[in-house]
A protein has these predicted regions:
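A glycine-/polar-enriched beta->alpha junction
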Residues: 31-41, 48-63, 78-80, 89-106, ...
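Amphipathic alpha-helical coiled-coil scaffold segments and their short linker/junction regions
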Residues: 30-36, 174-175, 179, 209-268, ...
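Short, charged, amphipathic alpha-helical segments
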Residues: 105-109, 172-181, 371-379
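Periplasmic alpha-helical coiled-coil/stalk elements that build and connect Gram-negative outer-membrane
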Residues: 24, 122-237, 331-338
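Amphipathic alpha-helical coiled-coil segments
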Residues: 42-57, 122, 126-147, 156-158, ...
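Residues that define the transmembrane beta-barrel architecture of outer-membrane proteins
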Residues: 83-87, 279-283
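Terminal intrinsically disordered/low-complexity segments used for targeting and assembly
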Residues: 1-35, 52, 71, 193-233, ...
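Transmembrane beta-barrel strands of outer-membrane/channel proteins
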Residues: 65-71, 268-274
Length: 412
């Protein structure tokens, strides 16, 4: 009778974090991961550096100031009558040919835009990855709690099985069956404890100071994603694809710069030279040009190389869009099937296991079913609830993964 009373007791899931404990919610984890993320700061620094470089690239090169002596005689100095020695000061300025300065500045701005888009894309990837890690940690922790409840119930079953045996009415086989069930429950709890520790370690990659906090008792309420066709059409605006688009812009800027390289740079020099002995001082002006006499082996080859890289950027952009589309299709189908499986577990698997346990409880009270059969049914019910729990986590995980493609918040 005592065994029947124990078996009829309601199964109560472990509550959430104790009162007053600091809880790490789904939103908290995603916010903390973005607040202190070295990868994002590195990209922001790189983008800012490129922006600053664009100003420098649009500016003329620094001029050169020359000081020196010219026509210094090696014999007869200083009594030579035709002394042409001059002490001179000159100013030299290089001027890049064509629109090189403007194009260099535009190229730096394009690179800054690409790095900013990469930072946005990385931010979205981090939100997805920390969300997945949080769901994994929640699922593992909840499963460990459930296994702990099963272990405690089987510990009680062992004690209750011993009571009839002490009065000579019980069966040693029932005690052994209870001990075997307890041993299996302990092993399952230890296995889930390992999984929970690994999940917490993975979460600490994103929130190292907060990964050890308690997690809520329930998963957040996730929204139904937009229709698949609508998400497909929005992939052109996906942050990661935008990075590829801007990378193509950088490659096109490199092509324009390579074409401009055939326009020679100029160097202008103006100088003043003084002579002694009452001789007239002199001024000097000269201009130098680069001569692209090897254009077929240098500038033309550089243009061809940059054109190839620009084609590569375009092909990578197209391939990346295909990759996004394939990932979206897979993520959407995974989310849909996870929902179907969860509904089946809730409406069929768990109710069937509960009905089987209730029937065996009734038979056991009437002396028609063994304790081992009841314990096996009890474990079957817990396994069903464990499956329901795992499928809840799988549905949440697939929804978080899908939010990476929908570019929207995954929950209210």
């Amino acid at each position: 009778m005592r065994i029947a009373l124990w078996l009829a007791s309601a199964f109560i899931a472990a509550a959430g974090a104790p009162a007053g404990a600091q809880v790490l919610t789904f939103d908290d984890a995603r916010r903390l991961a973005l607040d202190n993320q070295p990868a994002l700061r590195a990209l922001e620094h790189a983008a800012r550096a490129a922006q600053l470089g664009s100003v420098a690239d649009s500016t003329l090169p620094d001029p050169r100031l020359k000081l020196g002596a010219l026509n210094f005689p090696v014999q007869g100095f200083p009594s030579a009558r035709e002394d042409m020695t001059q002490l001179g000061l000159s100013w030299e300025q290089s001027i890049p040919g064509g629109d090189k300065r403007r194009l260099r500045s535009e190229r730096a701005n394009a690179e800054a835009g690409q790095l900013s888009a990469e930072a946005h894309s990385t931010m979205q990837s981090i939100q997805r990855d920390v969300g997945l890690a949080w769901v994994d940690a929640w699922s593992a922790t909840a499963a460990e709690r459930l296994a702990g409840e099963l272990q405690r119930e089987f510990e009680n079953a062992v004690e209750l099985a011993r009571i009839p045996l002490a009065s000579g009415k019980g069966s040693p086989a029932e005690v052994l069956a209870a001990r075997q069930a307890l041993s299996q429950a302990v092993d399952r709890r230890l296995e889930l404890s390992q999984q929970s520790a690994r999940a917490r370690a993975a979460l600490s990659r994103w929130v190292p100071e907060a990964a050890a906090r308690s997690l809520p008792a329930e998963l957040p309420q996730f929204e139904v994603p937009p229709p698949l066709d609508a998400v497909r059409k929005s992939l052109d605006a996906h942050p990661q694809h935008e990075t590829q688009v801007l990378a193509q812009g950088v490659a096109d800027a490199d092509v324009a710069l390579a074409r401009e390289a055939s326009k020679p740079d100029r160097t202008i020099e103006v100088g003043y030279y003084g002579r002694s002995g009452g001789r007239s001082d002199m001024v000097m002006f000269q201009i130098a040009f680069e001569l692209p006499v090897y254009a077929d082996r240098k500038q033309d080859r550089q243009v061809e190389a940059k054109l190839r890289l620009a084609e590569r950027a375009r092909d990578m952009r197209a391939d990346h869009l295909r990759e996004l589309q394939a990932g979206l299709e897979a993520a959407y189908e995974e989310w849909r099937l996870a929902g179907v499986r969860l509904e089946n577990a809730r409406t069929a698997t768990v109710p069937a296991a509960q009905a089987r346990l209730d029937a065996l409880n009734a038979q056991h009270r009437a002396g028609g079913a063994s304790l081992a059969a009841v314990l096996e049914a009890r474990r079957g019910l817990v396994e069903g609830r464990m499956q329901e729990l795992q499928l809840s986590g799988a549905l949440a995980r697939s929804r978080v993964a899908l939010s990476y493609y929908t570019n929207e918040g995954a929950h209210r």
